[in-house]
Amino acid sequence: MHTDEKIYEGKAKVLYPTDDPQVFQVHFKDDATAFNAQKRGAIAGKGRINCTISAHLFQMLAKAGIANHFLSQPAPDQMLVRAVQIIPVEVVVRNIAAGSLCQQTGLPLGTPLKKPLVEFYYKNDDLGDPLLTRERLLLLELATAAEIEQLEALARQINEHLIVFFQQCGITLVDFKLEFGRDQNQHILLADEISPDTCRLWNQSETDPEQRVMDKDRFRRDLGNVESAYEQVMARVLAQPL
């Protein structure tokens, strides 16, 4: 049971304490933002959908040996998680060229990458979440050299599991972002969420570059049918056994 006191409120979630100092309750919101919150709106049912998808994927990854913060889902839009100190770094994994990678490199949209690309972004809205080199991660003391290696290794492992899982759902995992945190013993755990908000997902049964989109790009690019796309992802995810 959480109190009314918030530990933290972000764009998509609110974090509350519980009776156990090592357990937090996360409330997933319907609020939607894009372009570092320059575009704002709401997606009906998004909190429930993203929480449910994340819970299923966290449990799947835990069974595959990926330690994460998920404990339980006491309500459709609520999750109990292990308390972690979030590392202020977004770890982005790219399998296919899209989004900023196309804008910054000139690669055509949809170009398969020969090897998954792992990138680190500073989780800092004031600075616009800039791309960081490993040297800058060390300079800012955001993580140790050993932790950086661990984050990349974990991201690649998670990518392998998610590619297979989404393939079984008839969905192509284009790219996605991850967040990690340190628990009370300084162990690194996968945290935050894995959902259409944080993944770029393409429907394999669609060839049209707009119709195939099943993620927050529908909101970013005003493609419409955002709620139905999220619902479809959830239905396909839940159809896969843990």
Swiss-Prot record:
Q: What are the disulfide bonds?
A: none
State whether keyword Ligase applies. Answer: yes
**Enzyme group, top EC level?**
ligase
Q: Which UniProt keywords apply?
A: ATP-binding, Ligase, Nucleotide-binding, Purine biosynthesis
Q: Which reaction does it catalyse?
A: 5-amino-1-(5-phospho-D-ribosyl)imidazole-4-carboxylate + L-aspartate + ATP = (2S)-2-[5-amino-1-(5-phospho-beta-D-ribosyl)imidazole-4-carboxamido]succinate + ADP + phosphate + 2 H(+)
Q: Which residues form a coiled coil?
A: none
Where is the secretion signal located? Answer: none
Q: Give the pathway annotation.
A: Purine metabolism; IMP biosynthesis via de novo pathway; 5-amino-1-(5-phospho-D-ribosyl)imidazole-4-carboxamide from 5-amino-1-(5-phospho-D-ribosyl)imidazole-4-carboxylate: step 1/2
Give the GO biological process terms.
'de novo' IMP biosynthetic process; cobalamin biosynthetic process
This enzyme's EC code(s): 6.3.2.6
Q: Name one GO molecular function term.
A: ATP binding
Q: Which SUPFAM superfamilies match?
A: SAICAR synthase-like
The family this protein is said to belong to: Belongs to the SAICAR synthetase family.
Q: What is this protein called?
A: Phosphoribosylaminoimidazole-succinocarboxamide synthase
The record lists the organism as Cyanothece sp. (strain PCC 7425 / ATCC 29141)
